[in-house]
């Protein structure tokens, strides 16, 4: 049993050049852990509060020195002397000090940074890799990389409404092969875009962000890239979407592809897409508060495609419990900074898995070189990870960590592949 003896935080930069929080934890046996907190561009209304300084003269108000001070001056006091291996007790002490439902007092960025750094220090003390420390001996499933290779919405300056167009290499035998397949399609897509005189500039998450006439045009380009790379759409590599529909929802209607649409019209649109394209997953197809629309959509196509709640659930066990009760969605997107502590993240995953909901572990658009989410994906045997295109080092860092984990697991490693999407039958 190793005791926490110190916490120290600092302000660093994320992949978009915005400040974020990094925390270091030190234990009495000399063990050390460091973690950095991500930040989102399209954020759910019900996410835990990310604490920013608000001084417009410094980093345009996005500084995080208040959160840094919260770690150094407040959180450290309540965790020093605690057993680092008792993650629930550590996180509970910090949550009680904050005392709010959404971490508004101290900031989710302060609490999460401390939570992850302490877990890393405890793993080091136990002489275990983080995935095995968090997940135990049964942690062995390598996730399908949901690679965001084409960006629209708030991740790009284009007239494509859907925020992310992803590929999922479901037919690969191993994670390393899946990664290779995805990389080859990514480069193939770049070549297709160049041939058409389209932009190969990158969005926040490393995907290309060309100005296209429609969402269907984006899907067609990706199918062409899959073919050009020598793979079969649907059998080898499937498609997935993050619609982020709360970004274009207002007063009960969706402004999508230049038209005002109802939830019923949006549902019909997605049902049609599922028929036409080899889609395995659609994230946030409807607004975060459109519970009725979500229930109808789930009933309509939930047996054909994975419907993922991101802004809908915000990794919050209470919102997820409501979704389960009302038959809404069939999968949970897991973002550690939406809820703001490792314990609450694992509680949400456990609730989802117990009720037959799939889990997709996810990065944010503002990332760092921190690789904790790669270890979490294996720790909980999620079978799916969303961490951007195979470009930009803050994205690739997670893929490289998964390669290391696969190598370390050896013959015990299993690649989730098509089994990650039991509702999908390849056409």
Curated annotation (Swiss-Prot):
UniProt keywords, alphabetically: Cytoplasm, Glycolysis, Lyase, Magnesium, Metal-binding, Secreted
Signal peptide bounds: none
Binding site for Mg(2+): 242, 283, 310
Any Pfam family: Enolase_N
Catalysis: reaction(s): (2R)-2-phosphoglycerate = phosphoenolpyruvate + H2O
Cofactor(s) essential for the protein: Mg(2+)
Keyword set includes Nucleotide-binding: no
Cofactor note: Binds a second Mg(2+) ion via substrate during catalysis.
PANTHER family: ENOLASE (PTHR11902:SF1)
Protein name: Enolase
Species assigned in the record: Kocuria rhizophila (strain ATCC 9341 / DSM 348 / NBRC 103217 / DC2201)
């Amino acid at each position: 049993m190793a005791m926490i003896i110190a916490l120290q935080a600092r302000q660093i930069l994320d992949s978009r050049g915005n400040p974020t929080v990094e925390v270091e934890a030190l234990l009495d046996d000399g063990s050390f852990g460091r973690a950095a907190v991500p930040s989102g561009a399209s954020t759910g209304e019900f996410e835990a509060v990310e604490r920013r300084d608000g001084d417009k003269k410094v980093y345009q108000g996005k500084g995080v020195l208040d959160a840094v001070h919260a770690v150094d001056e407040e959180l450290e006091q309540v965790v020093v002397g605690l057993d680092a291996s008792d993650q629930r007790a550590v996180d509970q002490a910090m949550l009680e000090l904050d005392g709010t439902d959404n971490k508004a007092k101290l900031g989710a960025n302060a609490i999460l940074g401390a939570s992850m750094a302490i877990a890393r220090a405890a793993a080091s003390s136990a002489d275990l890799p983080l995935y095995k420390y968090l997940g135990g001996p049964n942690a062995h499933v390598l996730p399908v990389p949901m690679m965001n290779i084409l960006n629209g919405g708030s991740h790009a300056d284009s007239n494509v409404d859907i925020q992310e167009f992803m590929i999922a290499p479901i037919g690969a035998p191993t994670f390393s092969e899946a990664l290779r397949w995805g990389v080859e399609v990514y480069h193939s897509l770049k070549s297709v875009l160049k041939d058409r005189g389209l932009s190969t500039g990158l969005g926040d998450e490393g995907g290309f962000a060309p100005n296209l006439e429609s969402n269907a045009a984006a899907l067609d380009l990706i199918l062409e890239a899959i073919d050009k790379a020598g793979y079969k759409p649907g059998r080898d590599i499937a498609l997935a979407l993050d619609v982020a529909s709360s970004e274009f929802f207002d007063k009960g209607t969706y402004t999508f592809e230049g038209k005002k649409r109802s939830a019923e019209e949006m549902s019909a649109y997605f049902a049609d897409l599922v028929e036409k394209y080899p889609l395995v997953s659609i994230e946030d197809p409807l607004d975060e508060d459109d519970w009725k629309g979500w229930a109808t959509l789930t009933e309509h196509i939930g047996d054909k495609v994975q419907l993922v709640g991101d802004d809908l659930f915000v990794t919050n066990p209470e919102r997820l419990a409501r979704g389960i009760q009302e038959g809404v969605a069939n999968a949970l997107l897991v973002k550690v900074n939406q809820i703001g502590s490792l314990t609450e993240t694992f509680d949400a995953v456990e609730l989802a898995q117990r009720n037959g909901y799939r889990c997709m572990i996810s990065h944010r658009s503002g990332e760092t070189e921190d690789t904790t989410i790669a270890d979490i994906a294996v720790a909980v045997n999620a079978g799916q990870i969303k961490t951007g295109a195979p470009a930009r080092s803050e994205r690739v860092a997670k893929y490289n960590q998964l390669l290391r984990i696969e190598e370390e697991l050896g013959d015990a490693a299993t690649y989730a592949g098509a089994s990650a999407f039991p509702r999908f039958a390849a056409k």
